[in-house]
C-alpha cells in the first residue's frame, strides 16, 4: 500500500483524485505520513513546493511544468538525487495522438507534430532529465 498526499484540488487535482479513487493500492493520508506527495498546484508554485517536499525526503509527483526554467528543473532533479528520493513530472499530452514519439534510449524525437505553435524544446527541458 502506497501512502499518498494530494496538494491542489483544481482541475487536474480532481482528475488525479478520481483516477486513483478508492484504489486498493493507494491510501490517501496526511502529508507527514505520505510516501508520495502529488502536486497539482499553479505552475509558479511548483519549484518552491517541490523543493520543500524533497527536503522533507518525500517522493514527489508534480503536474507539468516542473518549473518555469530549464536550470531550475535541473536543480530539482539534482536535489532529488542528493536527497535519495524520486521526482516525476506528468505530461499527459506526450501520450496523445498529436505526437509520434520515437524513444532512442537516450532521447526523444518528435516527428510530424500536428500542432505547430508548441515550443517543443521547453517541453523537453523539464521532463526528460531521467534519461540522462
PLM segments and residue spans:
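Short, well-ordered coil/turn elements that cap or connect secondary structure elements
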Residues: 1, 20-23, 55, 82-84, ...
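N-terminal Rossmann-like dinucleotide-binding module
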Residues: 1-32
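Nucleotide-activated donor-dependent transferases that construct or modify glycoconjugates
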Residues: 6, 44, 110
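Beta-loop-alpha module in the N-terminal Rossmann-like domain of NAD(P)-dependent dehydrogenases
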Residues: 16, 26, 30-79
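A contiguous active-site-proximal alpha/beta segment in oxidoreductase catalytic domains
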Residues: 68-118, 128
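Contiguous beta-strand/loop segments that form the cofactor/metal-binding neighborhood of enzyme cores
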Residues: 123-132
Amino acid at each position: 500500500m502506497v501512502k499518498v498526499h494530494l496538494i491542489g484540488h483544481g482541475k487536474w487535482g480532481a482528475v488525479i483524485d478520481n483516477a486513483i479513487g478508492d484504489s486498493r493500492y493507494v491510501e490517501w493520508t496526511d502529508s507527514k505520513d505520505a510516501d508520495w506527495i502529488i502536486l497539482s498546484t499553479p505552475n509558479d508554485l511548483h519549484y518552491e513546493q517541490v523543493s520543500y517536499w524533497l527536503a522533507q525526503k518525500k517522493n514527489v509527483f508534480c503536474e507539468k511544468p516542473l518549473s518555469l526554467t530549464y536550470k531550475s528543473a535541473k536543480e530539482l532533479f539534482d536535489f532529488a538525487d542528493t536527497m535519495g528520493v524520486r521526482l516525476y513530472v506528468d505530461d499527459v499530452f506526450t501520450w496523445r495522438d498529436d505526437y509520434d514519439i520515437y524513444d532512442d534510449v537516450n532521447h526523444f524525437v518528435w516527428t510530424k507534430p500536428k500542432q505547430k505553435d508548441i515550443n517543443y524544446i521547453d517541453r523537453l527541458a523539464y521532463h526528460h532529465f531521467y534519461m540522462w
